[in-house]
Amino acid sequence: SLGAYWALKMSKLYQLPAIIANPNLSPCFREDYPAIDEHDLDHDIPQLAYLELGDEILDMRQTMDQLESFMVVESVEGGHHRLEHPERINDLIHRLKEYF
C-alpha cells in the first residue's frame, strides 16, 4: 500500500506509467508524507489501479471513489490487504502495454 503511494508520486515526477494495488493514499505515520490529492492524479500519464475491496486495513471503497475519475480502476469484492488475487494484476499489465 505504501509502495503504491510512492509509485503514484514517482509516476508523476518521472512521467512513467504505473500500476498500483490497494494503495494508501493518506499515510499518517509521518508528517512529511502528504496525502495523494487531485494535483498528484490529474495528468495524462497512464495509471491503473487494482483494488480488493475487502482490505481489512484501508477503506478501498473510499480509495476507489478518489481514483476512478483519474485512472482505470479494477476492483473485486472480498480479498484482503495482502491481496488474495495478485494474478489479476497481469491483466492490467497487458492493458498498460496497449498504451505503448
PLM segments and residue spans:
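Gly/Ala-rich beta-loop-alpha elbow adjacent to hydrolase catalytic centers
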Residues: S1-A7
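Aromatic pocket-lining residues of Rossmann-like dinucleotide-binding sites
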Residues: M10-S11
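Active-site nucleophile loop of the alpha/beta-hydrolase fold
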Residues: L16-F29, E52
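Flexible "cap/lid" loop of the alpha/beta hydrolase fold
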Residues: P23-D44, E87-N90
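Short beta-strand/loop motif that positions the catalytic acidic residue
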Residues: D42-D44, L48-D55
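Acidic beta-to-alpha connecting loop that harbors the catalytic carboxylate
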Residues: L53-E56, E77-H80
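Conserved alpha/beta-hydrolase "acid-adjacent" motif
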Residues: D55-Q62, E84
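Catalytic histidine-centered segment of alpha/beta-hydrolase-like enzymes
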Residues: G79-I89
